[in-house]
């Protein structure tokens, strides 16, 4: 089906909309047939793929300095162990400290990386930036008194900010790095969590077992912990350079994250597989530095304007900080109002970017109007108009009509993560850049010299995998995402709870896994600004723990806390009542947002119900936070079971 790229402006007719919807479905069917569910390789469980998991940033000298301190930390029994030292783990630690009931010395953070930052530690590819405004994304700006350098911060600056937070709250010496947690086991007799895994030496292959004991454990390892490597046929037949964007190899490419002049690629034929939010930042850099660049694309990205610019100190002080203490949270809430498409929007759009001009993204993250029966029908024309502008932008910026056609996205805006960049599309005007559209046949196989796609062998010096992260569809629990076996009372595992009918209290704790807290989207709030959602989890868990400690009698040394059965089932009913808010995702092109095209209608009724229990809070992040704050204000810890032991 051929439709004009300018189709569907403000005056679009019903017939035109039907044509576009038919085009959307046509593209969806093409991709379902060519891909369906892609099998990924578990890189941490496959010796042949360990190269994709190794840490290229850990300095041997740094490992030596930390070894003795970490041995001491491992020997002691700890009050709280947090798994993950990215922003999630840091926010849990900071909010606990701010209650006044816990000190930094009560907390240990454990991470497989060699430093703070989480995904911002691992990702250091050229062009890396965050596409959520830095003034709302970088947490604790008021507390650290830091002004971001640009509206959209570089990955380097964000990682430095994680280190800044750790230093301010005395957490720098409370982390055990290069440590892979493999299991959490509840010891019923001692009422503690036994945390076990391996400590990595200078060489990742040198592994020593470790064990920690903790009264409380918090899982904050994040959703982007493991690079996704598709199981392409004969991938290891390839004799050239092969690496993942999350483990960028500057030794091969030349340059650095501070200076992405990649002199090592000057005479190289380079391929990048994938055109998601990562690739659109890398492609302009590779285009400038490679002799030839081949971009392998299955689904075109919908790329809007980013419009980054340096922070003006005077404006930052007068306009952004101008309304006094609490400015960052108010700005975050303002941003959420637009992205969740609240019925009554604020009079001023403080962030004023591409995200806040996309009310249809509320179909994915939920919003106050999401449960209304006609909401999808009402929001669809608005989204179609936006997508039409995105398609027009492609043809305006890309000189070749054929290439522009291949780069044109035909799907609802909420189906694939929106992208924002000012150089990506123009890169395809360069004579050394070739787009390879693989949406019909995909990549057939790798060869010693390159790979085969669409029946053509491409001889390549280097292949870069921009294929994202493993987001398990059937292992959606925090333990499944992190590859950690979590076993609670009576042998109940976290995986079983998620698979067999999840119930939580507020999306942060679940029965039979006592003294364990977690971050995630299942039965919790979702929003564009991930650090805001993580912070709300952290604030809530800190409240529950600190209030429980206040209630602990002085003659009791042990506290065991978990939801009541009634409490977590009541919360789950609230989730189920709002699950229909996400119904718009069902007809999307395959991707991690919809289980790579999983057809829920083919599941048995009980399986569909179990999936619905995994949903986020369907009425938007503001409604979720209101529910938590209302619960906290009552002061009763309703739905929480506390046991005090001498």
UniProtKB/Swiss-Prot annotation:
Catalytic activity: preaustinoid A + AH2 + O2 = preaustinoid A1 + A + H2O
Keywords of this entry: FAD, Flavoprotein, Monooxygenase, NADP, Oxidoreductase
Disulfide bond entries: none
Site residues (Transition state stabilizer), renumbered to this chain: 417
SUPFAM superfamilies from the UniProt entry: FAD/NAD(P)-binding domain (SSF51905)
Binding site residues for FAD: 119-122, 131-132, 137
Binding annotation for NADP(+): 129-131, 275-281, 298-299
UniProt record similarity statement: Belongs to the FAD-binding monooxygenase family.
GO BP: any one term: terpenoid biosynthetic process
Cofactor comment: Binds 1 FAD per subunit.
UniProt name for this protein: FAD-binding monooxygenase ausC
Highest rank taxon of the organism: Eukaryota
Pathway involvement of the protein, from the record: Secondary metabolite biosynthesis; terpenoid biosynthesis
Required cofactor names: FAD
The keyword Protein transport belongs to this UniProt entry's keyword annotation: no
EC number annotated for this UniProt entry: 1.14.13.-
Key word Flavoprotein present: yes
Compositional bias segments (type: Low complexity): 1-15
Region feature (Disordered): 1-20
